Every structure is written in structure tokens, then in C-alpha cells.
From Swiss-Prot:
Gene behind the chain: MT-ND2
Family: Belongs to the complex I subunit 2 family.
Function: Core subunit of the mitochondrial membrane respiratory chain NADH dehydrogenase (Complex I) which catalyzes electron transfer from NADH through the respiratory chain, using ubiquinone as an electron acceptor. Essential for the catalytic activity and assembly of complex I.
Entry protein name: NADH-ubiquinone oxidoreductase chain 2
Recorded GO CC terms: mitochondrial inner membrane
Coiled-coil regions, chain positions: none
Amino acid sequence: MNPMIFTSLLATIMLGTSIVLTSSHWFLTWLGFEMNMMAIIPVLMKKYNPRSMEAATKYFLTQATASMILVLAIIINLMYSGQWTIMIMENPTASMLITIALVMKLGLAPFHFWVPEVTQGVSLSSGLILLTWQKIAPLSLLYQIFPSINTNLLLIMSLLSIMIGGWGGLNQTQLRKIMAYSSIAHMGWMIAIMIYNPNLSLLNLLIYIMMTSSMFMLLIINSTTSTSSLSRAWNINPIVVSTMMVILLSLGGLPPLTGFMPKWMIIQELTKNSSVMLPSLMAILALLNLFFYMRLTYSTALTMFPTMNNMKLTWQFQSTNIMPMMMSLISMSMLALPLAPSLITLN
């Protein structure tokens, strides 16, 4: 793809998200979503092959359906309230339809089926945009309308997402699908806490984007897309692969890594609101994610294939060429847990 065209598409994606973030009018919000969707489809098809075309088609159909539901909900809300303002949600049917539309855009269960397939069919760089930047606009709209949303519906969807995000990743060997199921589970955590503390949900989103971006950058450096290629990469660049394993454990929420911080704070906040069963179920279901992350780490780092001695010597003199900004991002993805006490105090 021409670099100028690619840059223009990325700028349009950012502009569409910015319109959604700053708008208080339903029409401008819908316009921002449409700009975002139409600009990212060529990005998903950057590597022009049948798999990327299929992935882009699935993404388009899902997002177009969600946009249709969103427009229907906006019209119903306009009929009852006579207002285009986002904060005014007087009709429960419109509120439920908007929730379903945003959940489809986010890829939460039971509307999650497109996320692993689309992520697997696109390149690593496109998958990075899909699983990080594309979550910002729907979550920001949920943040604005959460007082009018059916809380029971959101809690059921969040628990389903955490469970499916764990179960779905158990038998996966493709790293992009593993990251997709990880995204589904993390979205479940964000939606569950948004009802009680929306600001904590935004903090969780920030940490999730930081960890997922670090993981995808390291996958791009190593050009690894499956567990077998990850095992072979250990002989070539063990430092980078070791860092990837630590970030995977951080995504699973293993203390004392960064990923433990949002889960700890969410469970604490839910407990403060006299909810004991919900955080208990969430913590138990999160063990599924941690299990396949630890299994992947074990199979990659601790069970190496027999190799010749000269193969083991190659990585000792190889430079990694990692940018300082990227190193800072990776460090924060692994070592930000000491910030938790101050954040809890502020909260």
C-alpha cells in the first residue's frame, strides 16, 4: 500500500474516533463511527489475499449491522425525547438497542464470533489497531450513557465475555487468536466495573492498550504468528521472546506484574459495592486465561527442542534494535504494579 494512502487512512481512523470522543450529538457520533469503519477496512486488507478480504468482509458486515441497530436506537430515542443529545436516554428499548450495538462493535459475548476470525485473517500491524484503537470509540460512548444502561444485561455480557475469553484460548496455537480471546476477556472486565466506577474502566483500558501494544510490537519484531514459530524464535532472540512471555503473564494478571493491578482494583471496587459473588466468579474465570498463558510460556521457554551448539551461539551476537519509546512501553507493561497503592488512595 502507498505510504501516503496508508497515512491518510490512519489519520481518518483517528479523526473518526476523535469525533466520537468529543461529540455530544447522536448524528456526529454515528458519523464518527462510519468514518472509522470505512477507513479501517483498507487497512485490514493491506496484505491483499483471500484471507484478509474475508476478514475485512466479516468486519464490515458486523460493524454495518451494529451501525444499523445504532441508527434505529437513535431514531427511537428521538421519537420519545425529541433531543439529539447523547446524555438524554428516556426509552429503555433505545437504551437496550444502543447497548447491543456497542457490544457488537466491541466484540463482547455473545457477539464475539467475529473477533478471533478477523484478527487471524489480517496482518499483525492491522491486528494491533483492531484490538486497541478500535475499542476506544465504543467504550467512550458507553462511558457517556452508562447511567441509562440496563446493568443486569451488562453484567451478564461481561461474565460471558470473561468465560469465553478464557475457554476460547485454551486450545489455540495461533498467537493472533490468543490475543483476540484475551481482548474479549479484558473487555468483560472493563464492562463489569463501568457500572460501579467508570474511571476505573478507563484505567483498565489504558493498561490493556499498553500491554497489548507491547505484545504485538514484539510479535512484529520476531515475525511470529504461532506457538511453533515462537518456540523457534527462542534460539534466535531469547531476550525478546523472554520479554514476550513476561508480557503474556502480565496480560493474564499474574502478580507482581502490571496486569494484576486493574484486576486487583476492580475486585476491590466490586467488593466495596457489596458484590461478593460477581468478583469471585470473575477471579475464578480469569484463571482460565492465566492457565493458557502459563502453558504457552512453559512450552516456549522451558521445553526447548534439541539443537546443535552452533545454533545456540547465533543469538548471542544479534542486536534487537528496539526503540527507546518501545522499551518504555514494554517496561510499563511489566513493572507498573508499584503505582497501584497511590491509585487506590486517589480512588
